[in-house]
Amino acid sequence: MEPKYQRILIKLSGEALAGEKGVGIDIPTVQAIAKEIAEVHVSGVQIALVIGGGNLWRGEPAADAGMDRVQADYTGMLGTVMNALVMADSLQHYGVDTRVQTAIPMQNVAEPYIRGRALRHLEKNRIVVFGAGIGSPYFSTDTTAALRAAEIEADAILMAKNGVDGVYNADPKKDANAVKFDELTHGEVIKRGLKIMDATASTLSMDNDIDLVVFNMNEAGNIQRVVFGEHIGTTVSNKVCD
């Protein structure tokens, strides 16, 4: 069976690395995620990763508490680098050649982000983990995921959610009548104000015709199911739904 997507970017929340603790980095949890990614990688799919930093730091609440927003955001970017290094180590543990590239140069721990080098790594079947956001404050890691996916010409962004199995018209944890969407267009997401990604990230994905698949990462095997075209979660694309 052939994969539906040949090159993907997986977007993980920082909280996904925290496990049941909710904060920090839980190594067994990271290793479990890395194992799933490694199993997909064996099929020949080219994989890049963007990981948030919310398990270690959140810039907006810090700014609300009085910290300078720019400094708060830079602090968060460093958190994403920590997550990237830990994930890369876990992927190496499963025999996957992995590189970390950061938008802020820190040559002693990672490569600087260079698009051509990232593409070469992917073509050589290495996984690339992008850290430090886009290197500028005020931009989320969702926007980083959309931008890097466009730059590496990814077929899809896999938005791996913590315990959420797709996109709903209301919060399913608060509304028992919430309805899940199987398919949406990027335009519908923006028009309805659905909080999948921020508006900048949604617009980037729409303008560059990149599919977005939102699914529950807590169910083992779901990454592989998405890559091979099984209909789980919610698919967002530019195709008009029937």
From Swiss-Prot:
It comes from the Bacteria. Residues 19-24 are annotated as: Involved in allosteric activation by GTP. It is an enzyme of class 2 (transferase). This is Uridylate kinase. Keywords: Allosteric enzyme, ATP-binding, Cytoplasm, Kinase, Nucleotide-binding, Pyrimidine biosynthesis, Transferase. Its EC number is 2.7.4.22. Catalyzes the reversible phosphorylation of UMP to UDP. Homohexamer. Pathway: Pyrimidine metabolism; CTP biosynthesis via de novo pathway; UDP from UMP (UMPK route): step 1/1. Allosterically activated by GTP. Inhibited by UTP. It holds the Pfam family AA_kinase. The keyword Membrane does not apply. NCBIfam families: pyrH_bact (TIGR02075). The keyword Transferase applies. One of its GO terms (cellular component) is cytoplasm. It comes from Streptococcus pyogenes serotype M1. ATP binds at K11, L12, S13, G14, G54, R58, N162, Y168, D171. The gene is pyrH. It catalyses: UMP + ATP = UDP + ADP. Belongs to the UMP kinase family. One of its GO terms (molecular function) is UMP kinase activity. UMP binds at G53, D73, I134, G135, S136, P137, Y138, F139, S140, T141.
